[in-house]
């Protein structure tokens, strides 16, 4: 599928892109993440693949856990576009290797270190489009964190 900026064609769309979409912070298999210029404490995640629905999954997950004790592990979702193609989320800061927790809640399965960051001094997951909350529930059980991407370094 096309890069997100290719969706923004025409004067209005180009102007919106210029005003709202800031520095590119990263990309994954189906989304690109940018600073949200109107409020740099937020990021905008733009879906680049059809039928993946990770933005919608994160939005729904946040709505389920927002008022639970488990919310402390998640970067809050602020808003989502009606079709789910764009999601606004609180911006986290990158973690140093020594800041990665040794244990995580059992429902986190995509334990790539770059899926986590710091928000107000707390380690949170900012990429939770894939998780095991439905299968494992909102358990307080902790497991050893397997930071699989660090083995490559």
Regions found by a protein language model. Give the residues of each.
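Intrinsically disordered, low-complexity segments enriched in small/polar residues
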Residues: 8, 20, 24-26, 119, ...
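Conserved kinase catalytic-core helix
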Residues: 65-153
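Short secondary-structure junctions
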Residues: 17-25, 75-76, 105-106
């Amino acid at each position: 599928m096309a890069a997100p900026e290719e969706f923004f064609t025409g004067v209005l769309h180009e102007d919106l892109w210029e005003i709202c979409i800031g520095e590119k912070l990263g990309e994954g298999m189906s989304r690109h993440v940018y600073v949200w210029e109107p409020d740099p404490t937020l990021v905008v995640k733009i879906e680049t693949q059809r039928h993946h629905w990770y933005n919608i999954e994160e939005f729904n997950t946040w709505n389920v856990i927002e008022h639970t004790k488990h919310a402390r592990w998640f970067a809050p979702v602020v808003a989502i576009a009606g079709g789910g193609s764009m999601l606004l989320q609180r911006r986290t800061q990158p973690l140093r290797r020594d800041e990665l927790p040794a244990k995580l809640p059992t429902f986190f399965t995509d334990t790539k270190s770059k899926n986590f960051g710091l928000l107000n001094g707390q380690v949170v997951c900012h990429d939770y489009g894939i998780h095991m909350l439905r299968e494992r529930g909102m358990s307080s059980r902790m497991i050893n964190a397997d930071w699989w991407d660090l083995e490559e370094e």
